[in-house]
Amino acid sequence: SRTLLAVRFGENHPGQLHKITGFFAESSIDLTFVQSRPYKIRPQQYVLIFEMIGHKSDPRLKKAFTQIEQEVRQSEGWKKVLGSFPYRERQVLDDEQLKP
């Protein structure tokens, strides 16, 4: 499974992304995608999107989400788990399999 998480801090400060990714590292969560997007209501602020391996019910993810929730509340921000979805590894084809 993969899970998507969105995070927005109330105010931007240096080191916020580092701190959030540290929570994932402490819980041995593998991030597969990270993106920042402008927040439409306040263009000077950003929403961080994280994709990770694991289901939202995984205890490791829950622990990291709790730590992130506490961190963003201090800056009057928010976090939202967008959901979990099944994921299947892509098959890599070799030259023999590609021949007609």
Give residue spans per PLM region:
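A conserved regulatory-domain signal marking ACT and ACT-like small-molecule sensing domains
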Residues: 1-100
